Amino acid sequence: MELDLRRIKAERIAKGYTQDIVAEKMGWKSRGPYAKRENGVVPFGADELADFGNILGYSVNELGIFFTKNVPEKER
């Protein structure tokens, strides 16, 4: 199972949030740490993914939407 980073970005944009807004809500002083995760440079930690989901209004039980078994490498 792989984390679908395109879905993460799409859901953030659909909710009207910029990377700066999400980073601030996650307690980071700049968007850099969040941007690195969304772009796949640094992996999301489990707690970070739960926090991200919560920011967008998803419960822990709904986080499965951010995972898929068949995300091609070039689309991650």
Give residue spans per PLM region.
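A short, Lys/Arg-rich alpha-helix, primarily the initiator
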Residues: 1-14
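Short alpha-helical elements of helix-turn-helix
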Residues: 5-6, 31, 46-49
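Residues within the helices of the helix-turn-helix
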Residues: 9, 20, 50
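Short, charged recognition helix plus adjacent turn
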Residues: 11, 36, 54, 61-76
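Short, basic-rich loop-to-helix N-cap that marks the start of a DNA-contacting helix
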Residues: 16, 41-54
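Short alpha-helical DNA-recognition segment
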Residues: 16-36
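DNA major-groove recognition helix of helix-turn-helix
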Residues: 26, 37-38, 48, 56, ...
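Residues in the helix-turn-helix
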Residues: 32-33, 43, 62
